[in-house]
Regions:
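Short secondary-structure boundary segments
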Residues: 1-2, 56
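Active-site loop signature of alpha/beta-hydrolase-fold enzymes
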Residues: 5
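Conserved active-site-proximal phosphate/metal-binding subdomains
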Residues: 8-25, 36-221
């Protein structure tokens, strides 16, 4: 998966990463990061991949059970540059649709962010049934292994709780919305069947157009 995807796999774009992987391994390769239509599928096949994986495209589907208020935030995200990677949620890199909560985190002091993380950790502990003894054990284990990981341990509950707010409770302003950059290029929700059929049709059309150019002598492809 290239950097265009969820942002947790590094900064190398798919167009650079994919040919490296295809040349390096002897197993089927499925490309991910930045794919949402037939043109991307055809490009991935041309690079040598056997197919593509899509997260954001299928998330933005009418078959999805995500509340409509949250899906509307995805559809309305039109600026690719604003769908940025952030470390503020749980200390790990992830790409997200901008919203009020992220804007607040960016302006908050480290102490405020820690207080918010502790509050979410308490909710996570209550929902998962984790005992206080188990929570303390995890905390002290992190402290022994790496004092710097304590903050990471405290923040670990942020992502699932904030995703719950937006993806389950339907409150996109107070949660987080993970996304690939292609969210800015998807103008409407569609069923999974429509998405797949549209990708196949477009890929075939683009392949036919390339073949026509080659047959007409307009290219050395």
């Amino acid at each position: 998966q290239g950097a265009e995807g969820g942002g947790h796999t590094g900064s190398v774009p798919t167009s650079v990463l994919l040919p490296q992987v295809v040349d390096a391994v002897k197993v089927p390769v499925v490309a991910a990061g930045g794919f949402f239509d037939g043109r991307g599928l055809l490009a991935a096949l041309a690079y040598g991949a056997q197919g593509i994986a899509m997260g954001t495209r299928f998330l933005m589907s009418t078959d999805n059970k995500v509340p409509r208020a949250t899906l509307e935030r995805y559809v309305n995200a039109k600026d690719v540059e604003k769908i940025q990677v952030s470390y503020l949620v749980d200390g790990m890199p992830q790409r997200m649709i901008p919203n009020e909560y992220l804007a607040m985190l960016e302006k908050a002091s480290p102490l405020t962010r820690l207080r918010l993380a502790l509050r979410l950790a308490q909710r996570y502990k209550a929902q998962t049934g984790m005992t206080s003894a188990h929570a303390l054990k995890v905390f002290w284990q992190g402290l022994r292994e790496d004092a710097g990981s304590v903050a990471q341990t405290v923040m670990a509950a942020n992502a699932p709780m904030l995703l719950q707010r937006s993806m389950i409770e339907g409150n996109p302003a107070e949660g987080v919305m993970a996304a690939g950059q292609v969210a800015a290029l998807i103008n409407r929700l569609a069923s999974c069947q429509e998405i797949i059929d549209g990708i196949i049709t477009q890929a075939r059309e683009r392949r036919a157009a390339l073949m026509a150019i080659s047959a007409a002598g307009g290219s050395h492809v």
